[in-house]
Amino acid sequence: MPFIFVVSFAILACIVVDTANHKGRGRPAKCKLPPDDGPCRARIPSYYFDRKTKTCKEFMYGGCEGNENNFENITTCQEECRAKKV
């Protein structure tokens, strides 16, 4: 029984350490926002980062308001939303 406790504790410690090592990685908060075309009707071709597919996709931006997950071109979207490594 003590052996199982020690092994369980060791596994838990490894998970905690691994989680701590990944702190600071990931994408910027703006890349986690849903696409928002805003209330205007300009229909400007833009790109947003799709969290589910982890790719940049085209959408039509209305030209006003919206949110920060809105990029003029696919290259900027990919560069800004690439997962950051520490």
Swiss-Prot record:
Which compartments does it reside in? Answer: Secreted
User: Glycosylation annotated at which residues?
Assistant: 73
Q: Does the keyword Transmembrane helix apply?
A: no
Keyword Ion transport on entry: no
Here the disulfide bonds are 31-81, 40-64, 56-77
Query: Which GO terms of the cellular component aspect does the record hold?
Result: extracellular space
GO MF: serine-type endopeptidase inhibitor activity; toxin activity
User: What protein does this entry describe?
Assistant: Kunitz-type anticoagulant protein Ir-CPI
- Organism field: Ixodes ricinus (Common tick)
The encoding gene is CPI
